[in-house]
Amino acid sequence: MLFDSIDHIAIISSNYQKAKDFYVDKLGFKVKKEVERKDRDDFIITLEAPNGILIELFIEKNPPRRVTRPEAAGLRHLAFRVQDIEESVEKLNKKGIETEEIRIDPQNGKR
């Protein structure tokens, strides 16, 4: 697994298969629970990392559009803590996941 820790987070997606492929097949999360909510016409997939951290994937066919600016309301980014950032980037790239260049946060000095 690529991560040491992350807090619980809920993420909305519109594509069940793509979301499940990305989080389960590429990042290595395990499906802990999957619920179809027929009354809402959606799914909730609870994913678990080896350290017990959870991600709830809400799969909605027509989620509201989000403004693309980073400053827009909603999730801005998802940050993972890793032992070796270069090694983790290399592993992600080998799985076909595009990454940005490694940056240093001017506020906290973290990469």
What residue spans do the PLM features occupy?
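Conserved active-site tyrosine of GNAT-family acetyltransferases
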Residues: 19-24, 92
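Short, conserved charged micro-motifs
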Residues: 18, 85-89
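Conserved short beta-strand elements that form part of the metal-binding/catalytic scaffold
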Residues: 30-69
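N-terminal beta-strand motif that seeds the catalytic metal site of vicinal oxygen chelate
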Residues: 1-17, 75-80
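Vicinal oxygen chelate
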Residues: 1-2, 35, 46-48, 89-111
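Conserved beta-strand-loop-alpha-helix junction that forms the acyl-donor binding cleft
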Residues: 13-15, 37-40, 106
